[in-house]
Amino acid sequence: MGEIAIRLLVTGGKATPGPPIGPALSPFKINPGKVVAEINKLTKEYEGLPVPVEIIINPETKEYKIIVGLPPTSALLMKAAGVTRGPQRTVHEWVGNVSMKDVVEIAKKKIDSMPTSSLKAAVKSVLGTARATGIKVENKDPKEVTKEVDEGKWDHIINE
């Protein structure tokens, strides 16, 4: 029998042995408390954010490894803006503001999971998510900042 992968979305630094982790591990007779402690240690940096986690289990040896993904871009933006939820209306309602440096840092973290290898394209993707999440960048609509990125205005920050 090969390895089994269990994919979960947990709250960074706050996973518990209850559902969904405990029930997912019980057929393999693996101590959920030990797994949860390790998950919490690995996700501490993203405390309070939704974090994708994959637990790879060898059912014969009961050995496992934990692979931690990155929180969604929207969650990283909301954390950087210091807000806990997005806009309540579909029309653009601004709930927060981040700096261009925050956008570039998020793009650098997420670039490996994006269909691009260009940091500039990754920054533009993060700007699109910021707009959809109701977060301004440098106190401007992210759509306006995207135009400025195309014009090269932010190259000094993107290329740092």
Curated annotation (Swiss-Prot):
Domain of life: Archaea
InterPro entries per record: Ribosomal_uL11, Ribosomal_uL11_C, Ribosomal_uL11_C_sf, Ribosomal_uL11_N, Ribosomal_uL11_N_sf
GO terms under cellular component: large ribosomal subunit
Biological process (GO), any one: translation
GO MF term (any one): structural constituent of ribosome
Record's keyword terms, sorted: Ribonucleoprotein, Ribosomal protein, RNA-binding, rRNA-binding
Function noted in UniProt: Forms part of the ribosomal stalk which helps the ribosome interact with GTP-bound translation factors.
Matches recorded under NCBIfam families: PRK01143.1
Complex and partners: Part of the ribosomal stalk of the 50S ribosomal subunit. Interacts with L10 and the large rRNA to form the base of the stalk. L10 forms an elongated spine to which L12 dimers bind in a sequential fashion forming a multimeric L10(L12)X complex.
Protein family (similarity comment): Belongs to the universal ribosomal protein uL11 family.
Protein name (Swiss-Prot/TrEMBL): Large ribosomal subunit protein uL11
Organism, as annotated: Nanoarchaeum equitans (strain Kin4-M)
Gene: rpl11
